[in-house]
Amino acid sequence: WYERFARLFQHEFERPKPIILYADHPDFQQTNTLSGQLSEGTGGVTESLKNRVIMPLTGSYGATDHVLGHELVHAFQYNIAQGRAGAGLQGLMMLPLWLVEGMAEYLSVGRDDPLTAMWLRDAIRREDLPTIKQMTTETRFFPYRFGEALWAFVGGKYGDEQIVDLYRRSLRVGWEPAIEQVLGTTSDSLSAEWREAVEAEYLPLMAGRQAPGESGALLLAPSTGAGHQNVSPSVSPDGRWVAFLSEKDLFQVKVNF
């Protein structure tokens, strides 16, 4: 990862950056290298000041490799921001998450990602693909997936080198002027081009498909007496019951029927 990113970013670290690995996620959550608590959904962390990468082994070589690549992108982002070419960490902290996290996802999973493709298909089906400005201002749009998809489009059309140039420029002038200066287009025009490309890719797949509500009845949801998180469903042999794990009780996850 380091050699690949060093070539792409045209940037080398002046000194090695520590990578702190934990045997599993529970050990990672108990790290004393960070203040505060880490949630189960946190896959890894890169410190902004020391640029240390802190992460667990996931039990899957592929997943661990992805998290390591993702966090090393952040290490490069921080290091560039702190150098002469950047504007300090303040410039980085002003950038939207779709730009920072989306770049880390794109450069660590590549242009064709099945998970991101699933998000895009669903957004097209619901006619809810965000614009760049919506991703910047509305938290309901997950920046990792939609940001990765946008960067994949930019990388495919303009080249990955332009992604790096856009990031560097964004540190100094902000993301919107950087799009105009580096790509020669506006954020609105880029949003329209991205939407057109996504629709061309996924709209043909929507033919003959039904929305979930048209295909069956919703069984496990707050509206039916279940919780917000309901996992591991198992149907009884006679089809009358569904056993599942749910957090609908206040203090614990229990088996429900």
Region spans (language model):
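Juxtacatalytic substrate-recognition/specificity segment
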Residues: 1-96, 113-115, 133-135, 175
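Active-site-proximal alpha-helical
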Residues: 2-5, 98-99, 103-113, 121-188
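Surface-exposed helix-capping loop/turn segments at secondary-structure junctions
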Residues: 7-15, 156, 160-162, 219-221
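Residue-level detector of short, conserved catalytic/binding motifs and their immediate flanks
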Residues: 17, 102, 240
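Short amphipathic alpha-helical interaction/hinge segments
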Residues: 30, 80, 115, 119, ...
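Aromatic-acidic/polar surface patches that form glycan- and anion
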Residues: 61-65, 97, 140-144, 228
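Beta/coil-rich, acidic/histidine-enriched accessory regions frequently appended to metallopeptidases
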Residues: 138-142, 165-257
